[in-house]
Amino acid sequence: MNKRQLIQSFLAASALSFGLAPAFAQTPTPIKFQLDWRFEGPAALFLHPAAKGYFKAAGLDVTIDAGNGSGGTVTRVASGAYEMGFADLAALMEFHANNPDSPNKPVAVMMVYNNTPASVMALKKSGITKPADLTGKKLGAPVFDAGRRAFPIFAKANNIGAVNWTAMDPTLRETMLMRGDIDAITGFTFTSLLNLEARGAKTADVVILPYPDYGVKLYGNVIIASPKLIKENPAAVKAFLSAFTKGAKEVIANPAAAIASVKARDGIVDSKLETRRLQLAIDTVINSPDARTEGFGVVNAGRMALMASQVSDAFNTKTRVSPDAVWTASLLPPAAELNTVLRK
């Protein structure tokens, strides 16, 4: 070996040892990730760690796309179009129970919204002040709305009689309430409240009946993964959850700064509005009293079993929901990592 070849061999070996040469670097694992909704405040939970390079540092090439509802996200992960996603746990349970023979049913791998964000909202002038006042009223929501789907659970917990439902596109829900076409709506609090304000309502004039405050302890959104990815590359799922956890801690600590990642993906968003939306989500469903009691990322077995039973009944599923089939804690980061996320 001549002197030039010796130097080249030394440089190549050095590059391999220190990870400096792309030619020798390990190829990142691609993961397509589907959100539950548009690029709004809560999307910062995922866009922030991506922008900070946490997924990349974990050996992942993560692509994050906006969604159009949890049901669609579950279906797309089940179809193989996406490896992972963010979706309402009730929607995942419904898919499992209605598609028992599906070979690729997604699995929840981390709890993010410890409480459902669903609530009933009305204007004070309607005279609605408590759940019992909803009996006989006209309620409105898109047919796929999580609050509407789970309303039978809310109604049973609060002895609400029959109500009349009106369906509409999501963009018309709050408008129809403001016009008086309907008496109340269901929706995620941090979405519908801000939408009502944007249409001229004052916060003080809006009555909010959050499901968790009225006896409905449903879990909300979870990170889901395809069973194929879990089986073939569990290390990738673990790496994703660890990077997400690191980012989530920063988002919760400084929501205003994290919104920059949302603005970068959708330049027309109102940063001030989305910061408020994110803060509402943090306060009501992410860093909620229930979340601080149970811990970030995990679930309570008894509460999960109750939800599975409630969803089976309320959604009239083909088969009963099996809690063990929809959830696994085996890929979560260590408790030492998870326990640093929430502010006490």
Where are these regions (language model features)?
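Short, glycine-/small- and polar/acidic-enriched structural segments
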Residues: A25-R179, D183-F190, L209-Y211, V216-K217
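Short, surface-exposed acidic
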Residues: A162-W165, T203-V206, I268-Q279, T317-V326
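Secondary-structure end/capping motifs
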Residues: E232-A314
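Conserved C-terminal helix/tail region of periplasmic/extracytoplasmic solute-binding proteins
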Residues: M304-K344
